[in-house]
From Swiss-Prot:
Family to which this protein belongs: Belongs to the universal ribosomal protein uL14 family.
Organism expressing this protein natively: Paraburkholderia phymatum (strain DSM 17167 / CIP 108236 / LMG 21445 / STM815) (Burkholderia phymatum)
GO BP: any one term: translation
GO-annotated molecular function: large ribosomal subunit rRNA binding; structural constituent of ribosome
Stretches of the chain forming a coiled coil according to its record: none
Name used for this protein in its record: Large ribosomal subunit protein uL14
Pfam family, one: Ribosomal_L14
Lineage: Bacteria, Pseudomonadati, Pseudomonadota, Betaproteobacteria, Burkholderiales
SMART domains named in the record: Ribosomal_L14
Subunit structure: Part of the 50S ribosomal subunit. Forms a cluster with proteins L3 and L19. In the 70S ribosome, L14 and L19 interact and together make contacts with the 16S rRNA in bridges B5 and B8.
């Protein structure tokens, strides 16, 4: 579960290393975001020659959470940390590579590009 002020690692090659959630999109009273939800993030740590700079604001989709996701068969998939992939204004991934596994829950019409770039889909 991701909420405002949560820091996430970045799972793509945009140049950002760490981002902070500044808003969970989808309703004024919405507090938490799970895997597959879109959030507004601020870049807190970036590599010197990356595509993004520290302090910039982007949309991002949550791809891994420490809380995990429960499947229909009762299984629970948890990760060591929280991670997101940065998106542009058209909600397309900015990076050209995805690092680490992503879950099948991202296999919607909107995020098929992320699933196809990911090295492993759980």
């Amino acid at each position: 579960m991701i909420q405002t002020e949560t820091r996430l690692e970045v799972a793509d090659n945009t140049g950002a290393r760490e981002v902070m959630c500044i808003k969970v999109l989808g309703g004024s009273k919405r507090r938490y975001a799970n895997i597959g939800d879109i959030i507004k993030v601020s870049v807190k740590e970036a590599t010197p020659r990356g595509r993004v700079k520290k302090g910039e604001i982007y949309n991002a989709v949550v791809v891994r959470t420490a809380k995990g996701v429960r499947r229909q068969d009762g299984s629970l998939i948890k990760f060591d940390g929280n991670a997101a992939v940065l998106l542009n204004t058209k909600l397309e991934p900015i990076g050209t590579r995805i690092f680490g596994p992503v879950t099948r829950e991202l296999r919607s019409e909107r995020f098929m590009k992320i699933v196809s770039l990911a090295p492993e889909v759980l």
